[in-house]
Each structure stands twice: as C-alpha cells, then as structure tokens.
Regions:
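Mature, function-bearing regions of proteins
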Residues: 1-266
C-alpha cells in the first residue's frame, strides 16, 4: 500500500448466529486505519492523538495501556519469536468519539520490510473491562487463520472451540477496501455458531472526512455498547444458552495455530 497517512473507513459491521435460532444484524460504522510506524516518524496533522478532540486516538486504549502502543506491540511480537515485522503496522481500530470509546476488536496488521504480511494481532475487549490478544503468525490475505478461543466475550457463547480469521485488503483503481471476518466454531465439524465481519472503503483522514463521520455517527461509542446489550436481550428472548463469565486466561496473548504451508505448482 502506498499511502502513509492516517485513513478512515466507512462501511458495515455484520453479525449472524446460526443456532439454536437464527439471529442476524448489520449496521453502518466507521473506523480508523493507522500506519503506526509512519505516525511515529512524522505524525499526521489530521489525527488527534493522545489529546482531547471530538474524534481522537489514544495509545493507552490498546495493549497494556502504556503511552506507546507500538512499543508494546513490538515487544509482544518479539516475545513470540517474531523479530522481522519491521515494515509498516496498520492498526484497524475505533477512535474515541466525544471522549468515549469501546473497541470490541482491533486488528494490528504487521508487515515485514518487503511489505509482506508477517503477523496479525487481534485485540479483543469485552464489556467487563477485560482485554485479550490473539497473535496470528505468518497469516496470508484471503487464507483462513485459526486460534483457540480462550477469552470470554459474550454470555451467549461458550469459551471453547476456535476462531477462524480471514483478512482482505484490496485496491481497485482509487478504491481501497479492507475486510476482517471472524467465524466462531464452538464444535468440531459443526457449522460456525457465529459469523462476524467489519468491512469498509478507506480514504484519507482529513478534517472533512472526520466531520462526515461524526455527522453520520455522532454517538458511535454509545451506539456500539447499546447495540451489544440490545442484541443480548434479543438472544435472551430467543432462549439462547447462557454461559457464566469464567476467569480470564493467565496469558495476555494466545498464539494462533500454525498456518498451512504455501503450495507451489510442480
């Protein structure tokens, strides 16, 4: 990708549950896509970082809460033996809106010096104030990557089974799009219990695009939290199984399963 400035995405969040009763919803959203290494080197005047603004990004909303989230990321990668992700790191995340933030999931796309995707860190938050990360080593765009589910997110989903992640970043002419899909399989061989995705078209973050985002979604953070609880009520009415919150995992980072080897033609 050639752009080194902060981007903003306008798109949709989708969620579908297959059983015991079908349940699905979709709603419009916006998000940030931030080139973290470039921002460290040169900043971006359009991005309010670590300061008050109607739309802002704060490092301490990520990782272990330190002032430099990129430093945390590099240390996390190194602890898992990944020392060659020295290229750009694109962070797909929700901003603070009017001082409030809730980020169900953020994605750190970590590239090698040659631009190849080296790792992805999926940073998950639940409504109980807990956070956990899934680290996918050597994933490939468009190819499923998996990790065991070890972290409680919803009282209507068990902490077992695995996540299957698929990531896409495509450019067609001037259009730059991103897609992140997560399917949750609670039982081996069964269809996915949950299918979720967030997708959008990216454009430069400017004062005009930020105003448009705030005009279209003036209370996005509150809306995200309200929708989570509204959908939980719908599942309770439909008598979806209820699971109590377990203790969080001992380790803050869960490594994903090894990616399948790349097949080469004979």
């Amino acid at each position: 990708m050639t752009s080194v400035g902060a981007l903003i995405g306008f798109g949709q969040v989708r969620h579908a549950r297959s059983r015991p009763r079908a349940h699905a919803f979709a709603y419009p959203t916006f998000f940030l896509m931030l080139p973290m290494r470039s921002l460290r080197a040169q900043g971006d005047g359009a991005l309010a970082r670590n300061r008050r603004a109607a739309l802002a990004f704060h490092d301490r909303d990520h990782g272990d809460g330190r002032a430099d989230s990129l430093q945390w990321l590099d240390e996390t990668l190194a602890a898992q033996g990944i020392t060659d992700a020295s290229g750009e790191v694109w962070l797909h995340t929700y901003p603070r809106v009017l001082g409030y933030v809730f980020k169900p999931v953020s994605f750190w796309y970590c590239h090698a010096a040659d631009g190849a995707l080296r790792a992805v860190v999926a940073e998950v938050n639940n409504t109980f104030g807990e956070r956990h990360c899934y680290l996918l080593d050597a994933p490939r765009y468009g190819v499923p990557a998996t990790a065991d589910k070890v972290f409680h997110v919803s009282p209507f989903c068990p902490v077992r089974g695995e996540y299957r992640f698929v990531f896409l970043r495509t450019q067609h002419g001037a259009e730059d799009r991103t897609v992140a899909r997560i399917d949750f399989h609670d039982e081996p061989g069964a269809e996915a219990l949950i299918r979720t995705s967030v997708s959008g078209t990216l454009e430069p973050l400017t004062e005009a695009s930020a105003r448009r985002a705030l005009w279209q979604h003036p209370a996005m953070t509150l809306g995200v939290v309200a929708r989570i609880h509204w959908q939980a009520l719908q599942l309770w009415i439909k008598r979806a199984p209820f699971f109590r919150q377990p203790a969080p995992p001992a380790d803050f980072v869960t490594p994903g399963h090894p990616s399948p080897p790349v097949s080469t033609p004979l």
